[in-house]
Amino acid sequence: MTTLMETRGATPTSGTTLRALTALEARRYARHPLFLVGVALLIWQVIVISQDAARAADGVSTTLVDVAIYPAFTLGLLGVFVGVHLTRSMARSREPIEASPTDGVNRVAAMCLACLVPGVVALVWFAWAYAVTAVWPLPATAMPSSSVAAIRGAGIVCAVGGPLFGVMVGRWTRFPGAGLLAAFVLFGWVMLSTGALAMSATRMSTLAHVWAPFVGWHSSDSVTGEAPWIAGGSPVWHLAYITALCGLAATAAMLHDAWGTQRARLIRVFVLVSVLALASLALAVAADPTRVPL
């Protein structure tokens, strides 16, 4: 009996195993060449924009309201490839944890948690965006500060969401080029929604704009960029919507390896998060479609 109790006590708990797996996957993510390329590109953009802001005679450009595209591309879109590659190569990193009992769902959950690595980098970028506008303030605008924060905060969510989408694709597909196809689908989805900015300001055009996982809010009626404006809709609720999309991607990825009651529980979570995503999208569209001049 004593031996049995000692054996049980020596067995790692599920939480301990998940932490060990997450640390392992986070290290793999942080060392991935494409992630490092994305970080380098983001740093380069930060340097260029900071120099432009310092040289500007009339203050910071209003386009700095809508700069989330930088982490969304360098960490999010490139992160799709990272997520697919690391998910498919998980088998190679099993050796260090062979002594720890685990299952496929735990391993995928750890991979999803590792996608917070680019989110941390994007969080540093978020702080930089506010530091720049604190030193060189933006021109006065009617846009509330919460909307500005939500537009910029989307960069953090996209930096995590792209890799999560890659993890999901990596679990459910096996054909070569799946990562490239997934990135192309995301890019096309965003480009399709951008076309709605050329439409008149209505709730239908707002829906066509904000249903994408990343949207550009800043535009102008002039080809020279004069008289810029921010598109209608609610950036805050759009942020909630894309956060829910991240939850859907993570849940769908874990569903691949789940069985029995675990699978049933994940399906319930998927349905609940789907409802939250649709509700957030509806609230984003329900906001005033009028464009806010900058």
Model segments located where?
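Hydrophobic alpha-helical transmembrane segments
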Residues: 1-89, 242-294
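Cytoplasmic juxtamembrane interface segments
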Residues: 9-16, 85-98, 155, 159-189
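Membrane-embedded alpha-helical segments of integral membrane proteins
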Residues: 198-257
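Aromatic-anchored segments of alpha-helical transmembrane domains
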Residues: 42-50, 123-124, 128, 184-196, ...
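Secretory targeting signals
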Residues: 46-78, 82-83, 112-180
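Alpha-helix N-cap/helix-start motif at helix boundaries, enriched for small hydrophobics
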Residues: 106-110
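Transmembrane helix segments
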Residues: 177-208
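Short helix-to-coil transition segments within interhelical loops
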Residues: 97-105
